[in-house]
Swiss-Prot record:
Disulfide bonds: none annotated. It comes from Arabidopsis thaliana (Mouse-ear cress). Functions as an E3 ubiquitin ligase. May be involved in the abscisic acid-mediated signaling pathway, at least during germination. The keyword Phosphoprotein applies. Its EC number is 2.3.2.27. It catalyses: S-ubiquitinyl-[E2 ubiquitin-conjugating enzyme]-L-cysteine + [acceptor protein]-L-lysine = [E2 ubiquitin-conjugating enzyme]-L-cysteine + N(6)-ubiquitinyl-[acceptor protein]-L-lysine. This is U-box domain-containing protein 9. The lineage of its organism: Eukaryota, Viridiplantae, Streptophyta, Embryophyta, Tracheophyta. ARM repeats lie at residues 201-244, 248-287, 289-328. It is found in: Nucleus; Cell membrane. GO terms for biological process: abscisic acid-activated signaling pathway; cellular response to abscisic acid stimulus; lateral root development; protein ubiquitination. Residues 73-147 form the U-box domain. Pathway: Protein modification; protein ubiquitination. Keywords: Abscisic acid signaling pathway, Cell membrane, Membrane, Nucleus, Phosphoprotein, Repeat, Transferase, Ubl conjugation pathway. The gene is PUB9.
Amino acid sequence: MAKTGVFDSDPTAIAKAKELKREMKKLLIKIDDEDDLGVQTIDQLQDALSALREATMRKMAKSSSLEMLETVSCPEEFRCPLSNELMRDPVVLASGQTYDKLFIQKWLSSGNRTCPKTQQVLPHTALTPNLLIREMISKWCKKNGLETKSQYHPNLVNEDETVTRSDREIFNSLLCKVSSSNLQDQKSAAKELRLLTRKGTEFRALFGESPDEITRLVNPLLHGSNPDEKLQEDVVTTLLNISIHDDSNKKLVCENPNVIPLLIDALRRGTVATRSNAAAAIFTLSALDSNKVLIGKSGILKPLIDLLEEGNPLAIKDVAAAIFTLCIAHENRSRAVRDGAVRVLGKKISNGLYVDELLAILAMLVTHWKAVEELGELGGVSWLLKITRESECKRNKENAIVILHTICFSDRTKWKEIKEEENAHGTITKLSREGTSRAQRKANGILDRLRKAMNLTHTA
């Protein structure tokens, strides 16, 4: 078996080494062919040899550090749950879990909308630096003679993010094709842009350089009432990929006057894949607070709620994530209630469908008085009590008791039903002892209210 070379595990280094070797081969052929050897040719050969030597030494140094790291027992709390390697740039996800930034970004860029460790649906995809863990890792590395650099996983550090002249030429050529009047050119270019923005960040970054590039991308969908289905899917998915890149791209995409109307149309008339990706794009764009308000004003909640009611399993999680994130902004909650969210959510939850995701949305909406009123009319107390009593998920129990707490303090006609449940099963008392800290507070609040109601009855 051939011995593994120093470049074998690093695709970027392999490419550089091959390029240097090709250059040296050309120079050697030139030397062999020339009778009168020039000094410039010799200098070029020396430069190529020096560059190859430097690249080799740099790779060997990285390999040495990796070998040393493998021999040292790394504390579990310093390891990324995704890679099981020492974290280089620890960040906190919305779920409260800490990951290495590179690995969690790859997870999110793949379209995932849950925490890998807890499976919790994420309200947003913002990442917060974990400075405490970073400092602890730094001290641990110094103590063990390790450098705190990207060498912990050099193979995954994307050195190809730099936009090359070739990337720019390809990008401009595809934008010219996608904004042309020829449907086949539009479709082939949109498909290629979708693939390029999914694979690498450099093409996402190129879209972020100017608002005009976004307009050119969506241009073929702005004309005509019946867009080609595949073209629509590829353009919408490209918008999703661009939005994942960073906050600057999210702002640029959302503020383009053509994008949100296009996404609304995709939610209403696209294929299942298009509608799902349109919802995912809305979820991603809504990570910015300013975008939540802007998107909410557009009327997008109604088609999202309609799609939720349809209940297509391929789209429903993206739709739920989009509604949840939008409703973090208080002004969007009244819009969601007005557009029929409570009825749709109540029907799904009472039938045991997607309870985890939908109950979290409902727990936010009950801060609006009309949501409480609708839940009462829908018989919501009975199935909320059932979830509180029977669910094995602590988060679902918490959300159910949060909603019941709001109902209890807003509608005294429901006290009797809650009291009967408590007398028969001790459901709320049990939760006040065994639930999450928030669930315990809400359960105790309900019990206090019921006791006061009993005292008033006896006093009267």
